A protein has these predicted regions:
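Bacterial N-terminal signal peptides that target proteins for export
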Residues: 1-8
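Bacterial N-terminal signal peptides
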Residues: 8-16
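Sec/Tat signal peptide C-region and signal peptidase I cleavage site
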Residues: 17-23
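Pre-active-site segment of Zn-dependent metallo-hydrolases
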Residues: 31-114, 173-193, 219-233
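Active-site environment of divalent metal-dependent phosphoester hydrolases
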Residues: 34-39, 61-62, 81-86, 126, ...
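Active-site neighborhood of phospho(di)ester-bond hydrolases with catalytic His/Asp-centered motifs
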Residues: 54-58, 72-88, 124-128, 214-219, ...
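Active-site-proximal loop/helix segments of hydrolase catalytic cores
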Residues: 58-66, 186-259
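Binuclear metal-ion centers of metallo-dependent hydrolases, dominated by the metallo-beta-lactamase
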Residues: 116-125, 132-160, 255-319
């Protein structure tokens, strides 16, 4: 039986829709629409089965009611620095400059991560001793302490069909005393102390379509990027910090990608600069330097622009 042209078109559309449904969607939530800005950290990963993971809400999410969030099943936090856990944040997008956005809203002493988890009734997944900290914060603010879940080094948890494993990140993780408050916090600040909540972490996510993603968090160069992230997990897509000073810079980050992790593609993160203007990479930036140094396709996380990746970490839409 020969198909009519309309039947053939319908069949093609069905195949295309099925292929798209098997992809992982990644949506950056930055401070300025269509740009990659200095405080941009947050990404939303959406599994083909609908599970949505907010990675490091930081300062670029406009509170728990930010309409860009939608449903959030998991809040994933790499460490407790304010630009990742969220000590302050924007009130709305496109306020201030890309290099210095307005962040007038405080989330202390809870953190934006906790505020989002409470509002969305989502889990918070962390490694090291951060799990106990978030459990206490959730309980103190009317939530369920059990919603703070631990994936310690070498182990993993699965939430909504997505496997989350903790990997090494070489970075500090001091807890700002303002998360504690009161005379204890005052004494800590007066003496230059930060609280201990364990080591900073990176993560490896395995989605239901088979895609394995490495999330660097804030890190330097580590042997585990080769032996664990590539050797064991075989990550096909990476999200890599490039900001320098606090983390690997463009050259170091490119070495991690080219020689250690060796994914098929990479998304830039944590540039600490206005990396784009009008959606185009600015000349002379760390963003440009990294993209020139890596040997694989690299993608700038333009705020609000959804990218789709197949099981091999290849961008098939939005890049």
């Amino acid at each position: 039986m020969r198909k009519t042209p309309m039947a053939a078109i319908a069949a093609f559309a069905l195949v295309a829709a099925s292929a798209s449904a098997a992809n992982v969607k990644v949506t950056p939530l930055g401070t300025h629409d269509g740009e990659f800005c200095a405080q941009d950290r947050a990404l939303v990963f959406e599994d083909p089965n609908g599970t949505r993971i907010l990675y490091d809400p930081g300062r670029s999410v406009a509170g728990a009611e930010d309409p860009r969030l939608g449903k959030i099943d998991v809040v994933l936090v790499t460490h407790m620095h304010g630009d990742h856990a969220g000590n302050i944040h924007i009130k709305d997008v496109n306020q201030g400059e890309c290099g210095k956005p307005d962040t007038p809203v405080s989330s202390m002493p809870k953190s934006l991560a906790v505020e989002v988890a409470l509002a969305k009734k989502s889990k918070i997944v962390t490694g090291s001793e951060m799990q106990a900290f978030f459990a206490a914060k959730l309980k103190a603010n009317g939530g369920n302490a059990a919603d703070s879940m631990l994936a310690r080094y070498g182990g993993s948890v699965t939430v909504g069909g997505v496997k989350i494993a903790t990997v090494t990140a070489m970075h500090s993780n001091g807890l700002d005393p303002d998360y504690i408050g009161g005379p204890v916090a005052d004494a800590m600040k007066a003496n230059g102390f930060a609280g201990y909540v364990g080591e900073a972490t990176g993560y490896v996510l395995k989605f239901s379509n088979g895609l394995v993603v490495y999330l660097s968090g804030d890190t330097g160069i580590t042997k585990d990027q080769e032996t664990v992230v590539r050797g064991y997990y075989n990550a096909k897509l990476a999200v890599m910090n490039i900001g320098d000073g606090f983390t690997t810079g463009p050259a170091e980050a490119a070495y991690v990608i080219n020689d250690l992790v060796k994914p098929n593609e990479v998304i830039l993160s944590h540039a600490n600069e206005p990396g784009t203007q009008g959606g185009k990479v600015r000349a002379g930036t760390k963003t440009e330097a990294f993209m020139k140094a890596v040997k694989i396709p690299s993608h700038v996380p333009l705020s609000g622009k959804t990218m789709e990746f197949d099981a091999n970490g290849k961008c098939v839409s939005g890049c």
